[in-house]
């Protein structure tokens, strides 16, 4: 609809209406298809609309003519996506101002009425209150807490709710003015993190970052004087895929310095941001959520060489802060059942002060979801508990910010916040059946949906009651207000009161004759004949007939129940059904006796069907996950059941149970797309992980062989002799090639787990949506109107999704516990620095008996005290050896991996070693060994000690000294 012509079109449709019924039908449609507010800025258009309402015998039309401001603004909308953007708020206020001016300029002004001059809904009162409200909106400072609510006379106006919601939304989405903790001046890393966070908050407030120059200077200092803070990708076993936060943090620092990295090197070759003992010791726990790259590394078992006690002390400080933060949140949110702005402001300020923004909640949630199971959490003290509290707070924070964006004292927020609460509850329940450690329930300790009730606005019952009472001149208008309050606020009070029309004992809606007019002049037979001759769309009736005490039961028997049965059995098409339902609501709407209690649920059913048919099927998002109350379909069942029951009370002998064919078809049309989408997601997940899992199994098996194989180290050539084949054979692998292969295998497994976890996250959203529909179905299954819920079979869909999630968890658990997951740790000796450095070797080569002593060397040499029993290498086949397939796979991983050599081939050439004898010139006896007898050596300490160093033998030392360099 063209916004500028919408009121013109409405006036034209009213002019074309041939009778009262058709006029009212046009007006009732505004309840579900609102009018554009922009078209109310012209008094000429408003006057043209009022001129079409010339039927002076109807109370509803008279109400509209006398109170056009209330009526038109009640059904007017800004016509834009709500909430309005912050930049559109002043334009929206301008539209309201133009509408007020247009109503004030109406010539002639609306007719006077017998109502008191101070009637709440009078034009003058509405326009005065609206002008005051506009002035208040213009004076608002959105950086300060907002507490305003619409005035009593404006609470039911759609456009007022929309602009109220938009102003509150603008306040909540702007960062609060908070005092950030002072960063530790001794830590350049923390100063950078804190300043960059403060700059981001300033940019969000449309302010230039105050510390831009200091940030640039800090970045240069970090890159020049703190180079060891950055870990090259070639050093760590993780990659930018498994450490994306560390990579992104490093990129942010490099980007502050012009030409820090040429071309696209920043994306490919930049290091990751690490940390050192000094950084962890200086870290302030108040900034725990700015250190996401630290937690990311710890969860991937990467400590960058930091001392264990340093890491654990850092975790202990963070844990204490998180416990205190959680206690504050619980205190602020417990025992609150309705909207509590002060508590919301306090929690928001506390979150922003420690860096827990909406983006940080999503960052931590994703990081914790893709973190490998087990690993460091079982080795580092306090890490498991800290991760539990991080998960608990960030899960709550994610839903907190979702509610915050929807928070206001309006029915719009009431509906949206309830959806978030239901989604939070479903998501919380969806994690328990399949995730690891579900029994511990880290994020399940808080009743998140209960704490979020601080966002749920309370219905303004007193204001609604005043509005309802002020509309007493038209029972039909009161009925529409009661219906809208029921629909918007889920409040039954005024919906029930609207059934009790004055003077009719609940059986009339005004008119001149109440419930008994014409009863003495019209027989039941005449009323029955009239009702049996009615067809949908008829508008003519005799007043004495519709006001007869026989009209309601005869109309219900001959018209209402047959029409309802035809609709509910699905015998009429959609547009025909809506037409007939609307006719049942509006036929003799203010004159007929005894039908009010039936027409009101039919009115709600009509609006609900219009909404459902307008939206089409629901997908797997929030709509599907929403609710334990049955959602839109549950409301529809309630309305039809109420109308059918009321009609049966008039005609006890007619009809049976409520037909369900239409409602079952609506259920299927609503949820069939979701079922297809969820099954497609499961199929896509299995298709995606199948090649990954196959490759993962093979890599894990090869890694197991490498871990359990026995190696010979050829020190002269720097090769590892790796067993190969069932027959005694081997592959001589250069140590650098072997190390690179091991690193690639481990990082590939970690990357595969990240990809699987990301796919699992998507699947879990579908699983949560499926649980939401099943939760809704539990309500529908207990409803008096019994639907056929067998198709789609969401129980089968749930089992399919759950099977996929369990399969992922099984794969992830096995992978995390495999040799491949920690392959570099198993071969840690290869990655350690050499025990004898180049400087020591030079001292050995340049040794002078007159100048130097050999104490340091002799102390490291011990006489072997035992012989290690071993199987003969030449004769016995190795228990763990690579096969041809393994070798092919290893060469695909690292093309430098060499080909095998069968036993008996020429070994690598080595330089003959020259055995030297030690003299007693330093008063040390010569060590003599039979090297033919002692094929291998081992060192057994007298006391149990833990050493990260490898021992050397005399033979190896001789080879190192006399070999080629």
From Swiss-Prot:
Domain of life: Viruses
Keyword Cytoplasm listed: no
Region Interaction with large tegument protein, residue ranges: 489-965
GO biological process: virion assembly
GO cellular component: host cell Golgi apparatus; host cell nucleus; viral tegument
Subcellular localization, as worded in the UniProt entry: Virion tegument; Host cytoplasm; Host nucleus; Host Golgi apparatus, Host trans-Golgi network
Family note: Belongs to the herpesviridae inner tegument protein family.
Subunit structure: Interacts (via C-terminus) with the large tegument protein/LTP (via N-terminus).
Entries under HAMAP family matching the protein: HSV_ITP
This protein's name: Inner tegument protein
Organism: Equine herpesvirus 2 (strain 86/87) (EHV-2)
């Amino acid at each position: 609809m063209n916004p500028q012509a919408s009121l013109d079109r409405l006036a034209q449709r009213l002019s074309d209406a041939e009778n009262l019924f058709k006029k009212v039908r046009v007006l009732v449609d505004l309840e579900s298809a609102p009018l554009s507010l922009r078209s109310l800025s012209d008094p000429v258009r408003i006057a043209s609309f009022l001129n079409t309402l010339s039927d002076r015998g109807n109370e509803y039309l008279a109400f509209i003519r006398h109170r056009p401001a209330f009526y038109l603004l009640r059904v007017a909308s800004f016509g834009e996506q709500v909430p309005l953007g912050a930049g559109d708020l002043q334009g929206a206020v301008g539209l309201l101002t133009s509408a007020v001016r247009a109503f004030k300029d109406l010539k002639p002004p609306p007719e006077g009425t017998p109502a008191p001059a101070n009637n709440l809904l009078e034009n003058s009162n509405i326009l005065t209150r609206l002008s005051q409200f506009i002035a208040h909106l213009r004076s608002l400072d959105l950086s300060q807490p907002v507490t305003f609510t619409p005035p009593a006379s404006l609470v039911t106006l759609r456009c007022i709710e929309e602009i109220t919601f938009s102003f509150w939304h603008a306040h909540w989405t702007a960062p609060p003015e908070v005092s950030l903790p002072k960063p530790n001046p001794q830590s350049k890393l923390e100063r950078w993190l804190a300043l960059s966070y403060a700059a981001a908050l300033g940019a969000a407030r449309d302010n230039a970052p105050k510390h831009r120059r200091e940030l640039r200077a800090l970045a240069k200092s970090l890159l020049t004087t703190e180079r060891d803070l950055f870990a090259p990708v070639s050093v760590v076993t993780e990659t930018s895929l498994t450490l994306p936060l560390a990579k992104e943090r490093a990129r942010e620092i490099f980007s502050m310095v012009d030409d820090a990295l040429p071309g696209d090197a920043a994306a490919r070759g930049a290091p990751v941001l690490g940390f050192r003992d000094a950084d962890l010791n200086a870290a302030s726990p108040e900034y725990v959520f700015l250190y996401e790259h630290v937690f990311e590394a710890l969860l991937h078992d990467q400590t960058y060489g930091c001392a264990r006690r340093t890491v654990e002390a850092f975790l202990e400080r963070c844990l204490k802060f998180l416990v205190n933060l959680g206690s504050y949140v619980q205190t602020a949110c417990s025992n609150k059942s309705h909207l509590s702005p002060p508590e919301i402001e306090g929690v928001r300020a506390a979150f922003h002060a420690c860096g827990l923004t909406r983006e940080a909640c999503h960052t931590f949630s994703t990081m914790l979801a893709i973190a490998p199971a087990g690993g460091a959490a079982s080795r580092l003290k306090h890490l498991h508990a800290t991760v539990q509290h991080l998960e608990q707070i960030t899960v709550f924070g994610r839903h907190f910010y979702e509610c915050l964006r929807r928070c206001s004292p309006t029915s719009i927020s009431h509906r949206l916040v309830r959806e978030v609460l239901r989604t939070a509850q479903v998501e919380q329940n969806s994690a328990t059946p399949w995730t690891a450690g579900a029994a511990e329930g880290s994020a399940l300790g808080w009743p998140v949906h209960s704490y979020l009730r601080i966002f749920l606005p309370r219905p303004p019952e007193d204001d609604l009651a005043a509005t309802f009472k002020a509309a007493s001149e038209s029972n039909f208008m009161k009925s529409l207000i009661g219906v809208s309050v029921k629909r918007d606020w889920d409040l039954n009070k005024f919906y029930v009161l609207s059934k009790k029309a004055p003077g009719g004992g609940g059986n009339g809606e005004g008119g001149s004759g109440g419930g008994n007019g014409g009863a003495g002049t019209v027989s039941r037979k005449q009323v029955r004949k009239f009702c049996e001759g009615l067809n949908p769309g008829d508008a003519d009736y005799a007043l004495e007939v519709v006001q007869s005490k026989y009209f309601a039961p005869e109309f219900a028997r001959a018209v209402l129940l047959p029409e309802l049965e035809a609709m509910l059995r699905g015998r009429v098409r959609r547009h025909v059904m809506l037409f007939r339902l609307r006719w049942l609501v509006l036929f003799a709407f203010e004159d007929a006796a005894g039908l009010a209690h039936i027409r009101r649920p039919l009115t709600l059913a009509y609006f609900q069907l219009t909404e459902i048919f307008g939206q089409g099927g629901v997908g797997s998002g929030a709509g599907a996950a929403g609710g334990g109350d049955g959602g839109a379909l549950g409301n529809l069942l309630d309305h039809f059941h109420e109308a059918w029951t009321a009609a049966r009370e008039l005609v006890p002998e007619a009809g049976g149970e409520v037909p369900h064919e239409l409602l079952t078809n609506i259920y299927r049309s609503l949820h069939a797309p979701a079922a297809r989408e969820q099954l497609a997601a499961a199929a896509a997940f299995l298709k995606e992980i199948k090649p990954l899992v196959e490759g993962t199994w093979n890599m894990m098996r090869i890694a197991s062989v490498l871990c359990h194989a026995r190696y010979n180290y050829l020190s002269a050539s720097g090769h590892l002799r790796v067993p190969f084949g069932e027959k005694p054979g081997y592959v001589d692998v250069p140590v650098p090639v072997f190390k690179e292969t091991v690193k690639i295998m481990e990082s590939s497994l970690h990357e595969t787990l990240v990809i699987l976890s990301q796919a699992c996250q998507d699947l879990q959203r579908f699983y949560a949506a499926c649980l939401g529909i099943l939760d809704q179905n539990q309500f529908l299954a207990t409803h008096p109107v019994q639907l056929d819920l067998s198709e789609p079979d969401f129980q089968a869909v749930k089992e399919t999704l759950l099977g996929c999630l369990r399969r992922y968890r099984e794969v992830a658990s096995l992978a995390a516990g495999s040799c491949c997951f920690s392959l570099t740790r198993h071969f840690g000796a290869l990655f350690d620095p050499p025990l004898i450095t180049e400087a020591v070797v030079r001292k050995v080569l340049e040794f002078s008996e007159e100048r130097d002593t050999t104490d340091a060397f002799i102390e490291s040499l011990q006489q072997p005290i035992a012989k290690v029993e071993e199987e003969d290498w030449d004769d016995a086949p190795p228990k763990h050896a690579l096969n041809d397939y393994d070798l092919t796979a290893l060469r695909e991983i690292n093309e430098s991996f060499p080909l095998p050599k069968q036993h008996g081939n020429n070994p690598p050439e080595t330089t003959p070693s020259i055995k030297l004898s030690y003299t007693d010139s330093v008063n040390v006896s010569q060590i003599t060994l039979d090297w033919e007898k002692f094929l291998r050596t081992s060192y057994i300490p007298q006391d149990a000690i833990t050493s990260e160093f490898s021992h050397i033998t005399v033979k190896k030392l001789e080879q190192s000294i006399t070999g080629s360099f």
